[in-house]
Swiss-Prot record:
InterPro entries: OMP/PagP_b-brl, TSA. GO terms for cellular component: plasma membrane. The chain crosses the membrane at residues 67-87, 472-492. Residues 395-405, 413-422 have a biased composition (Basic and acidic residues). The keyword Transmembrane applies. It comes from the Bacteria. Keywords: Cell membrane, Membrane, Signal, Transmembrane, Transmembrane helix, Virulence. This is 56 kDa type-specific antigen.
Length: 524
């Protein structure tokens, strides 16, 4: 009996090596198809992943820091069936680890005088004055929820004073409506008149917002009477629509976390002088309502401790106690009361995070603290304390590396280069795919095959040293390989493949691996 072995195997870039069953031609020319199983090992490199951190030296703020990626490796397990001569179908799973990357951070070495030294190219260190400008986080306008819109529509005005009493102005009567516009839409009701700097006019932005019944087209531009409830209702609806059209590309939790991180980064030099610990962790994207509330209370306590530490150090500074008084929105409390439904939790989370962002937007207490810190920064005693602290930190860094000469030398070189390494992500993946394969060229000793596949990839691990919620997304792959007939019914498959991910992990990274695999296949 004459045998011609037709082999096809392929693994997906993060998934499975592929194999084929034996096809046996008997004396009558009959075709015998059969199942097969395969195990293998894989390794490769990561493509498609870009750092989320921007290069601070890029004036346009568009250049990302470069990533140094690890070499992922793992194992595969697959089962398949020859469905026709030269065509095979396979189902397999693969586990892959060490999907990691580090990012280069730091562009210079800070000396004890608070200056950055850069290599001038001539072997000498050229001091560059470090810019340390204190400015509060810029306001971020968050999408207005349906509940917040309804609150805005129902915002009433004050009645006019009785006859004989001082008459109230339009701004006094509509104070609550004006405050709603500022807090929820970031729009000032009155602005300086460009034709007369000493006068103020209604913000032209409000006049350009669509008003009136939506079925009337076109709707002409009209003056705004903020005391008129009908006009006010249409204005609130228009502002709400604009807030969703121009909403940030990231979640409210991420916006809040970035604001708090920025504040902590700004106050840390002063907190170090006062001996106050500043937290270095932000909010995870999956932060619960309780975590958001706790983070806001933590921020309040840190800022108040800092203010209290310098109270009395300078005249007319750090005098007013900081009380952010963050209160969870009423609609979020109602949504939490609905139970543990995932949708209700997500809606409550977004509402609470958005409310926290609005509290920090242009917060007078935080703005005053920043002004006081600017005054403190110019104080001779504080300058000397900062220089002493920087020198001590530099000395501690040097002493820490004295235990190992090689490590010290490497640290010195890194210091000269002005670069360090921080972990960007460290992930693992489990991939399952269904694949189809076809033989391209076949002999008795080997065959060349190609394949395509699709399936799901589940990713978990750490990003920026923080555990992430498991992410599952669609993937597709292509493979090209060689199957070698090693023994009766035993084949060795050598394969290269590429896998494309259709979704991003944590809305940041698209992991598209380029892989090579070695597998042993046995035909039953």
């Amino acid at each position: 009996m004459k045998k011609i072995m037709l082999i096809a195997s392929a693994m997906s870039a993060l998934s499975l090596p592929f194999s084929a069953s034996a096809i046996e031609l008997g004396e009558e020319g009959g075709l015998e198809c059969g199942p097969y199983g395969k195990v293998g090992i894989v390794g490769g490199m990561i493509t498609g992943a870009e750092s989320t951190r921007l290069d601070s030296t890029d004036s346009e703020g568009k250049k990302h820091l470069s990533l140094t990626t690890g070499l992922p490796f793992g194992g595969t397990l697959a089962a398949g069936m020859t469905i026709a001569p030269g065509f095979r179908a396979e189902l397999g799973v693969m586990y892959l680890r060490n999907i990691s990357a580090e990012v280069e951070v730091g562009k210079g070495k800070v000396d004890s005088k608070g200056e950055i030294k850069a290599d001038s190219g001539g072997g000498t260190d050229t001091p560059i004055r470090k810019r340390f400008k204190l400015t509060p986080p810029q306001p971020t306008i968050m999408p207005i929820s349906i509940a917040d819109r309804d609150v805005g529509v129902d915002t009433d005005i004050l009645a006019q004073a009785a006859a004989g009493q001082p008459q109230l102005t339009v701004e006094q009567r509509a104070a609550d409506r004006i405050a709603w516009l500022k807090n929820y839409a970031g729009i000032d009701y009155m602005v300086p008149d460009p034709q007369n700097p000493n006068a103020r006019v209604i913000n032209p932005v409000l006049l350009n917002i669509t008003q009136g019944p939506p079925n009337v087209q076109p709707r002409p531009r009209q003056n705004l009477d903020i005391l008129d409830h009908g006009q006010w209702r249409h204005l609130v609806v228009g502002v709400t629509a604009l807030s969703h059209a121009n909403k940030p590309s990231v979640t409210p939790v991420k916006v809040l976390s970035d604001k708090i991180t920025k504040i902590y980064s700004d106050i840390k030099p002063f907190a170090d002088i006062a001996g106050i610990d500043v937290p270095d962790t932000g909010l995870p994207n999956s932060a619960s309502v309780e975590q958001i509330q706790s983070k806001m209370q933590e921020l309040n306590d840190v800022l108040e401790d800092l203010r209290d530490s310098f109270d009395g150090y300078m005249g007319n500074a750090f005098a007013n106690q900081i009380q952010l008084n963050f209160v969870m929105p009423q609609q979020a409390q109602q949504q939490q009361g609905q139970g543990q439904q995932q949708q209700a939790q997500a809606t409550a989370q977004e509402a609470v995070a958005a409310a926290a962002v609005r509290l920090l937007n242009g917060n007078d207490q935080i703005a005053q603290l920043y002004k006081d810190l600017v005054k403190l920064q110019r104080h001779a005693g504080v300058k000397k304390a900062m220089e002493k602290l920087a020198a001590q930190q530099e000395e501690d860094a040097k002493n820490q590396g004295e235990g190992d000469c090689k490590q010290q030398q490497g640290a010195s070189e890194k210091s000269k280069e002005g670069k360090g390494k921080e972990t960007e992500f460290d992930l693992s993946m489990i991939v399952g795919q269904v694949k189809l394969y076809a033989d391209l060229f076949t002999t008795e000793s080997f065959s060349i095959y190609a394949g395509v596949g699709a399936g799901l990839a589940h990713t978990y691990g750490k990003i920026d040293d923080k555990d992430i919620k498991g992410h599952t997304g669609m993937v597709a792959s292509g493979a090209l390989g060689v199957a070698i007939n090693a023994a009766e019914g035993v084949y060795v498959d050598l394969e290269g493949s590429y896998m494309h991910s259709f979704s991003k992990i944590e809305e940041k990274y698209s992991i598209n691996p380029l892989m090579a695999s070695v597998g042993v296949r046995y035909n039953f």
